[in-house]
Amino acid sequence: MSGNTFGTLFKVTTFGESHGLALGAIVDGCPPGIELCEADLQRDLDLRKPGTSKHTTQRREADEVKIMSGVFEGKTTGTPIGLIIENTDQRSKDYGNIADTFRPAHADYTYDQKYGFRDYRGGGRSSARETAMRVAAGAIAKKYLKQQFGIEIQGFLSQLGPIKLEVKDLSQVYDNSFFSPDPDAIPELEEYMTALRREGDSVGAKITVIAKNVMPGLGAPVFDRLDADIAKAIMSINAVKGVEIGDGFDVVEQKGSQHRDEMTPEGFLSNHAGGVLGGISSGQDIVVHMALKPTSSITIPGKSIDRAGNPIEVITKGRHDPCVGIRATPIAEAMLAITIIDHLLRHRAQNADVVCSTPIINGQA
């Protein structure tokens, strides 16, 4: 299986399955000299880990990361950083009934068609459990970006099913299990999710993630556009079916006079473009939205086929998230951070000596 590595200079390779012995990652290309320990990664992992809320999967994993290489005397050496998280709460017997059947709208069928063989336990490699290693790698990227360049990345839940959330207080996003920017909406979210779980159904969600203080100049024209790589990074997350940069699909209804981000000596007057112009960062906030589908692992019977092509009825057992978007915020932050650090290192490698006489204007006046 190829396709397990992301990045050009800052490369992240992940490995492992949902019910395997462990998950792992190799982070290659990390700059040397960064103070780094497991605690730097554990905060983000604790935000993502399962079993922390009644509204997410009840699989309980400590997700304690071990740094195996690439750090000496508390600092990165510039060599590959090896990361491992052991799986400790697998319950593979829950999946025996799908060994020869396919859950509708799941990766079961396509993995079988591609490889002729699949690890059906918890979805194997297609499980969102894989994203734990992205979060660990992303925490390294986030620390470097903040320490060296003041770049900060903040995500939050912007919609759960029909409930759209206002951005009232971003400081409380990490203090509630929904990553809600509106503390007043939490009772409504809890009531909705409780009813959904009783129904045995699932629902989709929308996550917004913003990168602040990104310098202008990251990205390249045509095939290495910053927004194109952001879209690829976000689309690689399990269950993501749509990505928007800035105003996204809303631009269809806008006129040029509305959409253009006019400039003054004091700064940009708007940020409809989401911080990227011509595939290159403008110095404004990079604003990304992602839409996650409802998980197909539900207890409501659904039609499907078995490996012989016979019609069957599927009821998914096991422990699953009724809304995968609830735990997706740290994953989105990680993938945006990994993309930005990779482009920053690439930009520095080619353009470190570039001198531009045009002043850098503020992100927004």
Swiss-Prot record:
Reduced FMN (FMNH(2)). It catalyses: 5-O-(1-carboxyvinyl)-3-phosphoshikimate = chorismate + phosphate. One of its GO terms (biological process) is aromatic amino acid family biosynthetic process. GO terms for cellular component: cytosol. Gene3D superfamilies: Chorismate synthase AroC. Keywords: Amino-acid biosynthesis, Aromatic amino acid biosynthesis, FAD, Flavoprotein, FMN, Lyase, NADP. One of its GO terms (molecular function) is FMN binding. FMN binds at residues 125-127, 238-239, 278, 293-297, 319. Its EC number is 4.2.3.5. Its cofactor is FMNH2. Pathway: Metabolic intermediate biosynthesis; chorismate biosynthesis; chorismate from D-erythrose 4-phosphate and phosphoenolpyruvate: step 7/7. NADP(+) binds at residue 48. SUPFAM superfamilies: Chorismate synthase, AroC (SSF103263). Pfam families: Chorismate_synt. InterPro entries: Chorismate_synth (IPR000453), Chorismate_synth_AroC_sf (IPR035904), Chorismate_synthase_CS (IPR020541). This reaction introduces a second double bond into the aromatic ring system. Belongs to the chorismate synthase family. Homotetramer. HAMAP family: Chorismate_synth. This is Chorismate synthase. It comes from Marinomonas sp. (strain MWYL1). The gene is aroC.
